[in-house]
Structures are given as structure tokens and as C-alpha cells.
Regions:
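Solvent-exposed strand-loop boundary residues in beta-sheet-rich modules
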Residues: 92, 137-139
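C-terminal helix-rich "cap/oligomerization" subdomain common to oxidoreductases
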Residues: 91, 162-200
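Contiguous beta-strand/loop segments that form the cofactor/metal-binding neighborhood of enzyme cores
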Residues: 57-130, 147, 152, 160-166
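A short glycine-threonine-serine/GTX helix/turn-capping micro-motif
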Residues: 43-49, 142-151
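Electropositive phosphate-/nucleotide-binding environments in soluble metabolic enzymes
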Residues: 49, 53, 150-154, 173
Length: 200
């Protein structure tokens, strides 16, 4: 629900043209078994695919497809990325600075800076319920809250079910083309590190 409000705020021009996005998602797992899904290369483990996908998807939604990127990572004992950072650069010169970690808890927030203000998506930005919009144009700070029940995946399931009932195979909110572009970028980032899973 909050993502709808974010899209409205961005399209309204409240913060002007988006120039920078900072977003992170890091946590320290309670258990760190090498055989578990988080750290096991046989199960496509690592921070990028487990939690880094959320900041990356947010960047895609806000800024589109990047023209270039630079990235670095910390290889863990199982060979997967336990921590990673990525800078995405876009045709208009804007940038997204993204971070993921399975080594420590980060702020888990997103901060969108525009030419006329900014938007802070508060903690747990991958399932956001609160954002603060600060606009130099209106000289006001506005807090938008959209609480929800559950972990947020229920909204994805409901939306997908609605598409199926309508006989649709694509949609305007998250197109197949955008999904494939994000998957391709994830592969390119891992390629830049030299990280390949055993089944690839």
C-alpha cells in the first residue's frame, strides 16, 4: 500500500527530479549453518539474492534501468557473498547506492534525494509502512503511514491472483520486462565478482 503512495509522491514532483537513492537491507541470521539456504552455494545463497534484491527492485521502480554499475563483495567461508555493495549509474547522471548484508543489521531504510526535497522510507523498507516526505517547494514535512497485516507477501499474492482471474500475463506495476531486467542485473553483478553457483 505505501508503494502506491510513493509512486504518487514521485510523479507529483513533490521532491523534484530524483538524483540519488540510498537503500540497504542487512541482518544477522540467528543461525549460520553452511547447509542452510542463506549461505549454501548449492541453494543460491548469499546476501545479494536473499536481501539485496529488495533495494535493487526499489531502485528499478524509482530510477529504471541503469547504464552502468560498480560493485564489491565480501566472500564468506562457503563462497557466497555475505556482504555486498553496488553503485548504479543512470543516463541522466542520477545514482543508486545499495547495500546488502548477512553479517550485521543495517538501518534497513531507503532515502530518496531529489532536486526539491527528499523521501525517507522508514525501517523495513522492503515491506514499508511509513515514509516522511520533505519538500522545499511546499516548505512542509509530511508523514505517510499505511500499516498492514502480515509480512507483505499477501499483497503480491492477491495482486497476482487478480491478474490470473482477469486472464492477464503482464501488468503495468511490475512488468515481465522489468522483472527480467532485474534478474539480468543480478547475474551481471555476480559475474563482476566471479561468483558462480555449482549448478550454473
Amino acid at each position: 500500500p505505501l508503494m502506491k503512495e510513493l509512486r504518487k509522491a514521485l510523479s507529483s514532483g513533490e521532491i523534484g527530479e530524483v538524483r540519488t537513492l540510498h537503500a540497504d537491507f542487512g541482518f544477522k541470521p540467528k543461525t549460520r549453518e553452511p547447509e542452510g539456504r542463506l549461505l549454501n552455494p548449492e541453494l543460491a545463497g548469499g546476501s545479494l539474492l536473499d536481501v539485496g534484491i529488495y533495494p535493487l527492485s526499489l531502485a528499478s521502480m524509482i530510477m529504471g534501468k541503469p547504464k552502468s554499475f560498480v560493485s564489491d563483495w565480501n566472500r564468506g567461508s562457503t563462497g557466497v557473498d555475505e556482504q555486498a555493495s553496488c553503485i548504479l549509474k543512470y543516463d541522466n547522471g542520477s545514482m543508486a547506492l545499495l547495500h546488502s548484508s548477512l553479517e550485521s543489521e543495517t538501518r534497513q531504510e531507503a532515502f530518496i534525494s531529489g532536486t526539491e526535497g527528499n523521501i525517507r522510507i522508514h525501517k523495513q523498507c522492503w515491506k514499508p509502512q511509513k515514509m516522511t516526505i520533505t519538500s522545499r517547494l511546499s516548505q512542509k514535512e509530511k508523514i505517510v503511514e499505511r500499516p498492514f497485516v502480515g509480512n507483505g507477501f499477501n499483497y503480491e499474492a492477491e495482486f497476482f491472483g487478480k491478474l490470473l482471474l482477469e486472464g492477464k500475463t503482464d501488468n503495468e506495476i511490475m512488468s515481465l520486462e522489468e522483472s527480467l531486467a532485474i534478474m539480468s542485473l543480478l547475474d551481471q553483478i555476480r559475474d563482476s565478482w566471479g561468483l558462480r553457483y555449482p549448478f550454473e
